[in-house]
Amino acid sequence: WNEHYKMYDYIRNELPDLVMHHFPATAKKSISGHSMGGLGALVLALRNPDEYVSVSAFSPIVSPSQVPWGQQAFAAYLGENKDAWLDYDPVSLISQGQRVAEIMVDQGLSDDFYAEQLRTPNLEKICQEMNIKT
């Protein structure tokens, strides 16, 4: 299945073309997502900053290469090469110099996964260090 699992390419390339073809949309794109989709939104915006005018994430996992659930998912989707995982880790991408002007994250503090899996403070910290508005 993973040979054909190309969600990044679908969201970045195919979906915008589909939307532009079927809806009265402008060329300006924003991206948002919840949970794993929030991770995807952050990664897409950070890796393609000229393509998106804004990024919003709701309860995203922000440092997946550093937490048990993310490590398990990355091993399944990307294999055991941990260097490849960093290309899909928002905190790592920002620390490597990837930029967006502003990131909006909404995260409930009572979320059962907040401390162990989501690690939102890690994103806040790296954004402050790199002068990215949150």
Task: Please place each PLM-identified region on the residue numbering.
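Non-catalytic cap/lid and distal C-terminal segments of serine-dependent acyl enzymes
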Residues: W1-T134
